[in-house]
Amino acid sequence: MRTRFLNIDYFSTPPSHVFETLGFLNLPAPDNFPAPIVYNGEEDRLRFGSIENVSIPIGNLPIEAALSKFLSDVVPDRVSVDYRVFEIDDSSLGVYYSDEKDDGDAIADKATPKIIELETPELDFEMENKLLCTSEDHLQCFSEVLEIKNDPVKYEGSDIILQNSKDIQEQIYSVDYIPSDYFTENNTSVAENECFRKIQPWFKDARFPLLEVDEVNLSELSSLSVLDKVFTVLETIEPQDTNAGSSLIINSKELIGSKDYDLLDVLSTDCYLNKSGQSDVVPEDEFSEMDIVTILEISNAEEFQGKVAVPVTYEEFQILDVDISDVFDIFLCLQKAIEPEICYGMFSKEMNFKDFDELVVSSELAFTDDAFKSLPTPILHDYEMTRSLELIYEDVLSKIKPQSLSASNDIYLPWNLLEERNHNHCDYPFEEIVTFNIDYNWEASEGDKWVYDFIFSEDAFCEPLVEKCTEPFYGISNLDEHAPVNTSHGLLENPFQKTGARDCAVDDNAKKATLLFKSMSAFDDLTFFMDPKKAVIEDNLESRVEAAKTTNHKCMSIDSKASCRSGGMHPNPKTEEMILHSVRPSENIQALVGEFVKSYLTLVKDESENLSEDKLKLLSISKGKLIDCIRKANVHKTQLADDKTFTFALLLAIKQMTWYMCFFGIHVAYIYLNKVCRSSNPMKIGLHTLYSAVETEHKSDETDITRSHPSLAVIQGILQSEFARGNSKALLLAEKVFWSSLKRLLMSMGLSYNDLNSPSPSGNRPNVHEAIELGFLPISDCLIISYEQISPSFPVENFSVIVEYGGPNASPRYSFPSKLDSFPSFHFIKVELDMPSACGQLCAGVTVPYSLKMIKGDEVETKTGWLEEVLNFVPLEKVCYAGSSETTNESEFISMPQESERKRGIIEQGLSDQRSVIVVNTKTVDKEMIISRRSTYQKVLAMEKEGVQVVERDSDLPVDLMLSPAVCLLWYDSETVSKKSAATIGTSSSSLSWIGDIATNVLTSLSFSFSTCIMVFEGEPAFLAAVMDSSDELYAAAGSLGISLQMFCSSSANLTDEIILKCIKSSVKLSKLHVKMPESESLAESFLTKFPSVNPLTAQVILSSSGSLLEFMKLPHKSKVERTQKYHVPEESVDLFSSVCRYGAREDSRSVMTDSSSSVSSGPDSDTHHVSVHSGSKKKQYIAEKDEIDMDDLVHFSPSIEFADTQLKSSGDFQLDDSWSSKDHEIFHFDPVTEFSDAPFKPSGISHPNDSWPSKDPERFDKKSGPGSSSKDTFWEKDQPDFSVEDSLPGIPELEDWSFPVKDKFMSQNRGCKFPVMRDFNLHDNRNSENFIADYKGEVIDRADKYLEEDFPPSPGYNRFARIVSDVNEEELPRKSKSSRKLSFFGSLQPNFPKAADIDSSSERYATEKDSKYDNNTSLRGYADNYPAKRQRTLLEEVLTRRSAVPTTELPFREEISHFGGSPLSNAIRSSNQVQSSPWTVDFLNRVRERSRARKQQQSLPSYASPPSLETPGNIKKANTKRKSPSILEFFKYKGGNKLQEEKRQKRSKNSSASPKNERFYSPLKSCTPIDKRAKQSLSYTANGTGQTKLVWK
């Protein structure tokens, strides 16, 4: 409430502005000016009283003259002071004078100094409502005193100088006692001399100040009222100039003395209060925030007489927290109008209201120590505006404009014709009015405030006073139209209903309705009259007649023995009889409900054992009433109100949990309880005991699904019996809450299922016919749907059995079509609860919010909205359980069919409720990690108290913390970085070269698996300045890699800790969903982290997003992105992961614009082999001791021993790909004889060490492109239309996402070259890798073609020649020193490419092999025939699922595969006919043939012979220098259309094809070009005017 006074904050206003605009209280000059001042010392002594016990500073010593002389020589001279000086002023003014002389005084002959006499105002310093605040924010009072020019007074003969400066002025104004005796006298006049006698100045030659109040005028106001006094004083105030030159000392007790007195008494009795004149002087700083208004003197009263030295202060009126019952009494007890008392002075026009308003200061300036007590604001009633409620209603209704009746108003038929009773309730089937007596209970709480609450009286539990009609409105299904309605409310809400059956709608009503509908025309429809524009004219009224017939059913009582059919439609009479199954809560559910009852009664403080009638009433309190109590208890923000709020919330949670358990099982109740306990600590503490009991029972349900709810056992029996009779299709109708339990049951039974979980894009209802056309429904055994997804056109004829679980519904809710000739077997399961039992009472009055808005958790406009949202949580299936899959397309609305032998591992629901997770890297990666600093790591561990799970992982990624799947944090310390840089760089010219290493190596490796990188640099200012200078290099590198970079600089360890903790908290807030991560690393996580784009958090997301890893691998790429995107997994990481899984990894993963983007691998002397999936030091138990493998052993397999855990069951789960075996030099040096028998190696006798995917770019392949093995290439040919990737092969993973070749280094072409059987073979000998660089510039190749057999040289990742044939021993090879490299923080994953010197030094190692490589080549190089797809599929399935390989049995299969055709390119190369194509294609094929013949010539030479080309290191160096790291963009540059360029290109092609020297450097694999760097044009043929065609860029 705002008063009419101004609210001005004087302390926040600038001092200059206040000084210019504000004035002070102007007091008038006295009418009788004082007479000349005459000093009278006697009066001063009498005035202040004598001080008897004051001793002189040094007393006269009664000793001899000698001693006196001695003392006079030693002791300083004394100054004689008259004792009367102390009687005059006890405030130590510092000015002393004497009018007498002492005989022994040292200054007896000196003249008395001249004293300046001034006078102070008689009244205290008065102010208006304006204060001036100086720059020091001190409070100052100003009063103008005449300036007196006086020079400093110097005592004669002494060095003492009396200054007349600011100190004197402050002491003058610090007079603390100014009497006014006229208050104690009876007359109203004061003598003139009396005033001057009582207020004698202490100095001479002083003029009376202008700031003075006429005492006579003030005393004459004693006979006036308070209001007249105030305005009289205000009228006499005149403007007065102010002087802000002095800083005053304010008496605190004088300014705030009013706090000790009741202002109401002062104003009512017109008196002053007694106040002691003695006060302490304090500095003004302590009262800079005072709310000083003004000082007024009011005449005395007989009750309080005396002198007062304190002012009366005013403050703005405020509304106080008073007893609310008094407020109610004021408004409720006004029975008659009371004439207000009018004060005519208040409305006088002569009154200056503006000045009076300015006297009142805003309440915002009140003292913090409650020095001023706010006055209660009186309630002023405007009796002229007060009117009765009837008058208000009358005015409102009178303003309503009447609307004219429509022409069809008289045509309406009275609806009471349909009823024989006087009152009809069918129009409002869901409305009821219940009257309850509610009492107010007032309880005192903290701070003298009153808290009220509703107390349910005995009448509240009585039967509702109105009759509830359960008859639905004709032709409308109440449950379909009103989903949020409590379906159990009609059965359980009223425990006192009478048993027995009664007819709600008799047969006569149905007959009348039938006749009425037949007699009505199309225009008699109600919708036509309500809205003719939207009305639909029905040509056939039979549907309405049938709808009226369906309402002829009985409404039974809640007796459990009687079947109820209320609230829905039953099967058509033409169909078979409905089979009713009644179930009751099982013993384990009843035991848990008993625990719930104990906790419930404990909360309401009723702990007796027997369930009396009163306790039943307590248990049956409805959910709506409890929510009202929660809202009302939360009105007052006190501790008592909070306790009551959570008490009511616990009661409601127990009732809701019991309802879920009784109708949907323990599993659903556990999910709900888990959500509630995670919402807040009070709820978790209150439900801790119940949570333990439910969790224990829930764990036991995992072994036996039917223990969750007895209805599951009934459904299991129905399905087993129906399927045993040959019925293969079942339709399950249930609420979505029950879907999770149904799916668990079906998986345990080995049945596949689908669910219609999303609507069709063409309408509100799902179009099941579209699903049938797509072939989904016939695949699965069961279809799960909800009531909202059923339409009258639902094809129930496709199912042999229909099972509807009613849950809280007592009767079926679906009406089947009447036109069906054969109706399927229909089973309805109903749950029966005994109302006198605890289950029935706790479930009474509970509703479930099926509204979509409530499910999503929209904000409720109440203070307890979040609590209501948690209590209304519906445990729907939000995550995919094992055996189920989400939709792959938005237009599809059913999931993929489930296989019967899948694992039953269940992902716990509610990922959004689990704690957030951060990963700490415990492995040292070329720098000091955060975990090595104990103080920082302890603070990170302390985050677990705030709900953050801290997990340790030994990761090869050069990060300290992984805050989320997309965010990582790195910490660099100047000391460790400097030491490392000095040790590795040596005499490097740049001391910050490690910055460049971070930009090129670290950020590149992190860009695969993270989208945001946070770097914290800690060190001295010089180190930080150097980092900032080089920051542009880091930002440029991050921008080119597409990763967001944030850099922080810290000068101390504490600041570093603060930055890290802030980053963790920020990441937790941004990540809404988190996965629950185990403390130890699982085998699946260890496998996934070998991918360069998968970090531990991303791996956990992949494992948690579906039931199994195999299921995730089978998903399309779009579904993978959708599942991981909600956990903030970068889409690029998922793309790279999918590409690596499908095509394998590329070696040239760096940007093609850098010099390091070469396809050449580093040799064996390199510290890091170029692997696409590196496991680091994880799982050391998998490392084998053997480093070389004999080729005779490669084709022999034995059962797996060490990798048994990596392979799942024969149901088709994941098997470890042998492509990883050739990539990791630390882990996968294995002997296939003992380690990888289950891996899908090639058949015996056919080894394909060089099989790999051509590219990780999906655009390079046809849709049906697949593994690169020659044994499977024919399966992916385009001439096999009846076999595709999309076909699900039982027992094997999706071929679209998986490959099974033996893989070379990062990427190489697909080849089917056989491997010679050698005595010693090293899979990881890369010494000859650099010999395969070739001139591939300017050529265009069809990316859809695949290269088979011996088309191209083998991959640089493998050495085709034995180590004994090498010219140089491995020990003699030059090794690269670690000190010669730059500081590398990521040496295990980032490929290192050899330089020209390395290539030169290893060029002489090339040698050929004499052994015959192409034995049995005829069988592999034969013809292509159209092998039947069915046979292909059988053979492939046999190979991939075989547990062991026997050479004798696989030879026929090898021969059969040899007849499969090759790719178009392979066939063109082997063809003897000239290819009719463009010149560049012919030239390209000729070059391929030349290379093939050259290789054959080389292989025919003995092992000790040199290559035919006899190349020298110099030649190799020249070739490599010329063509080192060509940019892929050069391939796409437009060279122009002139003949010169064309001649050069043809000449180069001719030379390259004819020269055997160049062919050794040829590599058919192009470097992978990023999407953003690809050419914007494409090559195409165009015809010129002469009819010739040529290739041009478009």
UniProtKB/Swiss-Prot annotation:
Disruption phenotype: Reduction in the number of class I crossovers (COs) during meiosis. Impaired fertility due to altered male and female meiosis.
Cellular-component GO terms for this entry: nucleus; plasmodesma
Low complexity composition-biased segments: 1151-1165
Intracellular or extracellular location(s): Nucleus
Keywords associated with the record: DNA recombination, Meiosis, Nucleus
Top-level division of the source organism's lineage: Eukaryota
Stretches the record annotates as Disordered: 1148-1180, 1239-1283, 1396-1426, 1491-1523, 1536-1594
Alphabetical GO biological process terms: resolution of meiotic recombination intermediates
Tissue: Highest levels in young buds, where male meiosis occurs. Also present at low levels in plantlets, leaves, flowers, and roots.
InterPro entries, per database record: SHOC1-like
Bias kind Basic and acidic residues: ranges: 1254-1265, 1402-1414
Main localization of the protein described in the UniProt heading: nucleus
Biased composition (Polar residues): 1577-1594
Biological function: Essential for the formation of class I meiotic crossovers.
Family listed: Belongs to the XPF family.
The protein's assembly and partners: Interacts with PTD.
Protein name from the UniProt record: Protein SHORTAGE IN CHIASMATA 1
Designated gene of the protein: SHOC1
